[in-house]
Amino acid sequence: GYGADWRAAVSTTVATLPLGYADGIPRAVQGRGQVHLAGAMRPVAGRVSMDMLTVDVNEIADAAVGDEVVLIGAQGDGMIPCEELATRSHTITYEILSRLGSRVPRVFFEAGHITGHRNFGGGAA
C-alpha cells in the first residue's frame, strides 16, 4: 500500500478487497482493523487506500477470489459489531454508519435470513 508501511515478517498471502476510504472504511483501521474471512478474524495489512484495502490471509489455506469477507456484521459464529470498528477507528458508531458510501450494497437480515437488499451506486447487489 501507500508508503510501504506494512511489511510481512515472513512470506505471506495477502487478499485485496475492492473497497476503501471512498466507501467509508476508516483510514484509522490501519494496523488495528480486522475482517472475518472463512470463519477466522484476519488483520488489515497496511494502509486503507481510496478504493482497496489488503488483508493478511496467510493462515487461510483455501482463501479464494469471491469468498465472503465481513467488515461489519456476522459470519458463522463470529461477529464484528459496528461498535468494534468504531472503537478501533477512534470514532463513534454513527460516524461509521453515516460514512458508508453509495458503492456499498446494503443487505438486510432477519432471523438469519436475507430479507432484502439495496444498491445505491456501482457494483452488483
Predicted regions, residues:
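Active-site anion/phosphate-binding pocket segments in diverse small-molecule metabolic enzymes
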Residues: G1-A125
